[in-house]
Design a protein with these regions (language model features):
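N-terminal beta1-alpha1-beta2 submodule of the flavodoxin-like/Rossmannoid cofactor-binding fold
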Residues: 1-91, 148-166, 171-184
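Repeat-unit-sized solenoid/scaffold elements
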Residues: 71-76, 101-111, 138-144, 173-177
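Short, glycine-/small-residue-rich phosphate/pyrophosphate-handling segment
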Residues: 98-139, 149-156
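Mobile beta-alpha loop/short-helix "lid" or hinge segments that flank ligand
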Residues: 34-45, 91, 124-144
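His-Asp phosphorelay/catalytic-motif detector in bacterial-type signaling
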Residues: 94-95
Length: 184
């Protein structure tokens, strides 16, 4: 289950949030994970077709049953590079679970970004869970080194991961056992 850090900006607090979520995923038994940073992907910005696909990311998504996206809210939306990266791996997303972690300096914690990203993920074939994590006022949740300042925040991440892993297992069962257009 890759954790996709969805912004390339310098000084990004989203990186700390992504690392925290990733570390919590690593604690889960039987779950393979890796942190994928859009800033380091070799994806050309002038091509959104098959030629823009990063083979390593495609292979990661082929193996994955779920995807965690961690992204900040920029002007009520999501980062453009995140959208570009998502657009390059269309077949690999079909019938896989997705969970979104929003990050913002304000009180909404990326909620408006999440609202805008959900229909995009649905169009790509991902199935989003209903539970999100919102890092509201991120500077009061994480210090300048990325350490969590409020341990009571961890149960939110745990509930999010519980829901995401349940959905991932359910969708994996469906992909493996229920023919498309068929019945169980």
């Amino acid at each position: 289950m890759p954790v996709l850090l969805g912004t390339p900006r310098k000084g990004r607090m989203s990186e700390y949030a992504a690392r925290l979520v990733w570390s919590e995923v690593e604690k889960r038994q039987g779950v393979e994970t890796e942190l994928v940073d859009v800033a380091t992907l070799p994806i050309p910005v002038d091509d959104a077709g098959e030629g823009a696909k990063d083979p390593e990311l495609a292979e990661t998504m082929n193996r994955a049953d779920a995807l965690v996206i961690v992204a900040p809210e920029y002007n009520h939306g999501y980062p453009g590079l995140l959208k570009h990266v998502l657009d390059t791996n269309l077949p690999e997303y079909i019938h896989k679970a997705a969970g979104i972690v929003g990050v913002s300096a304000g009180v909404f914690g990326g909620a408006r970004m999440i609202q805008n990203l959900v229909p995009v993920l649905r169009e790509l074939g991902l199935v989003t869970i209903f539970w999100d994590v919102n890092f509201t006022s991120v500077h009061s949740r994480l210090d300048e080194d990325g350490a969590l300042l409020d341990e009571t925040f961890l149960p939110r991440i745990e509930k999010f991961l519980d829901e995401l892993l349940w959905m991932a297992a359910t969708l994996r069962y469906g992909r493996e056992n229920v023919p498309l257009g068929g019945s169980a």
